[in-house]
């Protein structure tokens, strides 16, 4: 008798939010078994952390003994082009893509060893390492790369936030954030491929290179945007010294600190969320307001 597939708790919770996600989850056990057979992988238990909410991810070993990771992504707007991004960056500075099934959002990637997340290091060290990774990510794509413009993601967010208007706690703050979400993607100068979700939890210690990035969500747009996710993960420092924190990281990246601040404000004020009364985000938005 085949053992039931273990489903990480955060992924299970996410799949309860829509019928489409529930249908995806119902098909997942058969898909994982078929992929493991097709790619000759013996799987261990899946990762079950606070960050495994948008994919089923498990370490494994191939028939030749090589360590790998199988990832089957939950379909969502921001992560649609992850496989294309891994192909584009081709292992530098991302993990290597070994096999993929684009139609299933499934990928077999190299396993980082020891795999310790960068978040275990002091934040000032995180700043330097993430800045160096972003400099390597921001390379000019070839013609026909297929990555969507950043404006497509911010338009998606704007529509979701607008649909929640009756839940807003500060109409003026949200309206100002929405205005910037419409404006900033079209005023950033040279557009480059962006990771859009690069933070210290998505950077792992490895052997092939000291640090490798996982989970890219590529779009093309303003490089100043790519500063935001790491900064949002540095909440105590950002609350205590917002200007100093933003200026330091912007200087490491070589991007305009004012544009980073505007992106941070726009996201804190108007990015979609479950709780529009979140006091931490309201406080951050007010501290960074133009």
Residue positions per predicted region:
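A conserved alpha-helical element in kinase catalytic cores
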Residues: 26-29, 64-108, 112, 116-137, ...
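ATP/Mg2+ or Mg2+-diphosphate-binding catalytic cores
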Residues: 16-19, 27, 163-164, 168, ...
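Conserved NTP-binding catalytic cores of kinases and kinase-like/nucleotidyltransferase enzymes
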Residues: 1-94, 206-210, 287-290
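Active-site Asp-x-Gly
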Residues: 205-258
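A cross-family kinase active-site recognition segment
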Residues: 2-6, 10, 116-172, 191, ...
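Short alpha-helical scaffolding segments that buttress acidic/His motifs in well-ordered protein cores
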Residues: 263-264
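An alpha-helical support segment within catalytic cores of ATP-dependent transferases
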Residues: 24-34, 142-196, 206, 251
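Active-site acidic catalytic loop and adjacent metal/ATP-binding pocket
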Residues: 47, 51-62, 69-70, 97, ...
């Amino acid at each position: 008798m085949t053992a039931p597939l273990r489903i990480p708790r955060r992924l299970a919770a996410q799949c309860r939010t829509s019928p489409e996600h529930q249908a995806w989850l119902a098909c997942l056990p058969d898909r994982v078994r078929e992929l493991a057979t097709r790619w000759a992988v013996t799987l261990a238990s899946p990762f079950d952390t606070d960050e495994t909410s948008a994919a089923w991810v498990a370490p494994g070993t191939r028939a030749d003994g090589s360590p790998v990771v199988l990832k089957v992504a939950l379909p969502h707007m921001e992560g649609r082009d992850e496989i294309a991004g891994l192909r584009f960056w081709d292992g530098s500075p991302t993990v290597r893509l070994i096999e993929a099934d684009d139609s299933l959002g499934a990928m077999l990637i190299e396993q980082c060893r020891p795999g310790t997340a960068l978040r275990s290091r002091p934040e000032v060290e995180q700043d330097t390492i993430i800045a160096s990774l972003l400099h390597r990510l921001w390379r000019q794509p070839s013609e026909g790369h297929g990555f969507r413009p950043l404006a497509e993601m911010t338009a998606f967010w704007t529509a979701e936030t607008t649909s929640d208007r009756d839940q807003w706690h500060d109409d003026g703050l949200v309206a100002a954030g929405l205005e910037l979400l419409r404006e900033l993607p079209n005023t950033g100068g040279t557009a480059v491929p962006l990771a859009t979700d690069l933070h210290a939890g998505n950077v792992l210690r490895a052997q092939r290179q000291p640090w490798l990035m996982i989970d890219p969500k590529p779009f093309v747009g303003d490089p100043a945007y790519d500063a935001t996710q790491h900064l949002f993960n540095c909440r105590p420092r950002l609350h205590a010294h917002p200007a100093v924190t933003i200026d330091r990281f912007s200087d490491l990246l070589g991007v305009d600190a004012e544009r980073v601040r505007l992106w941070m404000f726009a996201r804190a004020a108007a990015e979609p969320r479950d709780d529009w009364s979140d006091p931490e985000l309201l406080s951050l938005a007010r501290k960074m307001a133009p």
